[in-house]
Curated annotation (Swiss-Prot):
Pfam families linked to this entry: PAPS_reduct
Enzyme class, broadest EC rank: transferase
Oligomer status and interactors: Sulfate-activating enzymes, NodP and NodQ, may be physically associated.
Keyword Zinc on entry: no
Function in brief: Proposed to provide activated sulfate for transfer to nod factor.
UniProt cross-references to NCBIfam families, sorted A to Z: CysD, PRK05253.1, PRK12563.1
Gene Ontology MF: a single term: ATP binding
Species assigned in the record: Rhizobium meliloti (strain 1021) (Ensifer meliloti)
The name this protein goes by in its record: Sulfate adenylyltransferase subunit 2
Length: 299
């Protein structure tokens, strides 16, 4: 598959990754295990081949990820040999914080946002690369590739710096850090084309299969373990579904689909008119949800 635009996107992303290594003393990749993280992992491996990437990969584990995601994470770390760090907010675990008991907003803030902030401070990382893209969500659409964060890890859109002619300002003040998004200019379709071209392994949840789901708040939520309470009016049914995006399983909706290969997913996407993140409850639990979370230190 020869697609010139994919070569340009790949070159830009590798340039950004190398720029981070050249200008920061202690960078890390935020590895959330999804398709974008898989592409970012692949690009990082390419950027420094035959050497290993000169930075670790950090997964902030909320303890509510799909089981297949955790199995995939551990398998990739074994097979590729990259340095994997897993951080859990133990304060949240001790308090029993979860999506069912405390709601999506509190769960995400404590287990993801605060967990990430804890990990960045624990290891002293000054730059964190992540796989967010501008086409995913409106607050991400206005964020720069190099996104400066305050000493409290907050994002202020008014402090963003111009990025003209692929020239990046990587300087940070005392206590400040940088979030870096090498895939900013990619689209969901680009991601899948690149996965096809490069034969990148991804979590099987992206492919259609018969899975146990319940319909809740207009979404098909997969019953991944026995911690999920089933309401009296709800019925668990086996349906042919897949996921366009992955997160904590109680907060991530599946879509009805029969696409079981990457080419079939690409064909399916030609008819899709909604964002992949419309099936993420954390993006809709309040007005301006994603921007508010980013201002508090979210990815």
């Amino acid at each position: 598959m020869s697609l010139p635009h994919l070569r340009r996107l790949e070159a830009e992303a590798i340039h950004v990754i190398r720029e981070v290594v050249a200008t920061f003393s202690n960078p890390v990749v935020l590895y959330s295990i999804g398709k974008d993280s898989s592409v970012l992992l692949h690009l990082a491996m390419k950027a420094f081949y035959p050497a290993k990437p000169p930075f670790p990969f950090l997964h902030v584990d909320t303890k509510w990820k799909f089981r297949e995601m955790i199995e995939f994470r551990d398998r990739m770390a074994r097979e590729l040999g990259f340095d994997l760090l897993v951080h859990v907010n133990q304060d949240g675990v001790e308090q029993g914080i979860g999506p069912f008991t405390h709601g999506s907003n509190v769960h995400t803030h404590v287990m993801k946002t605060m967990g990430l902030r804890q990990a960045l401070e624990k290891y002293g990382f000054d730059a964190a690369l992540a796989g967010a893209r501008r086409d995913e969500e409106k607050s991400r659409a206005k964020e720069r590739i190099f996104s400066i964060r305050s000493a409290q890890h907050g994002w202020d859109p008014q402090r963003q710096r111009p990025e003209m002619w692929k020239t990046y300002n990587t300087r940070v003040g005392q206590g400040e850090t940088m979030r870096v998004f090498p895939l900013s200019n990619w689209t969901e379709f680009d991601i899948w084309q690149y996965i096809l071209r490069e034969e990148i392994p991804i979590v099987p949840l992206y492919f259609a299969a018969r899975r146990p789901v319940v319909k809740r708040e207009g979404m098909l939520i997969m019953v991944d373990d026995d911690r999920m309470p089933i309401q009296p009016e709800e019925e668990v049914t086996e349906q042919l579904v897949r996921f366009r995006t992955l997160g904590c399983y109680p907060l991530t909706g599946a879509v009805e689909s029969d696409a079981v290969t990457v080419p079939e997913i690409l064909r399916e996407m030609l008819t899709v008119r909604t964002s992949e993140r419309q099936s993420r409850l954390i993006d809709t639990d309040e007005v301006g949800a994603m921007e508010k979370k980013k201002r508090e230190g979210y990815f």
